[in-house]
Amino acid sequence: MNTDITVHPRLQHCGLTTANLDAMLEWYRKVLGIIVHNRVTAPAGSPFETVAFATNDEVNHRLSFFETSSVSIDQNKDHHARVQHIAFEYESLDDLLGTYVRLKKLGMVPLWAADQFFQTAIYYEDPDGNIIELNTNNFANDWTVTEQLRALPPQVHINVDPEKMIAARKAGASAWQLHERAVAGEFSPSASYELHTARW
């Protein structure tokens, strides 16, 4: 038993409170492909009414949802301490852009999309106003990405229009070429993202 050295555990799951469990589970099913492994009525005396455990990979649960009718969406959350966003990583830019297309067909549009030098990210808002980031690594491996993160320039993101990136990809550009062209400003959106309207 080690009692002297800090062991580095992995982040395993996040828990969210909600008054709207069914809508939340459906949203995360559509976006992340979650499967609910268990949904139980909380015992008497619990601060919650229902608890659901869900995952989209081999881990028993990545998200837990705690439903209680007494909670409400914080309309002033940008002034309060909180979890700012939760991120999920795709293996490739094609997977990320393909997800954007799939979600758009379902009427789900992002709040923001950007090339952040070390990664490309698209941000959505769930039914309770939580910000969910979908991203992919712009470099070959995690070690290279870490070095890029350490050397970030003052401007840490370049806004992009996923539609323009998809058109360039279909025209034959590689994922790396898309990154280079995004940084050069080629895929800038026609209109600015209204980030102030989101509950960041």
Language-model features and meaning:
Residues 1-3, 70-76:
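Short beta-strand/turn micro-motifs at beta-sheet edges
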Residues 2, 9, 19-26, 81, ...:
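Vicinal oxygen chelate
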Residues 5-8, 15, 55:
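Conserved N-terminal glycine/acidic-rich loop preference
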Residues 13, 51, 61-63, 85, ...:
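Histidine-centered active-site/metal-ligand motif
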Residues 17-63, 67:
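Core segments of cupin and vicinal oxygen chelate
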Residues 65-68, 79, 84:
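A broadly used, surface-exposed interaction patch
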Residues 68-70, 91:
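Histidine- and/or cysteine-centered catalytic micro-motif in compact active-site loops
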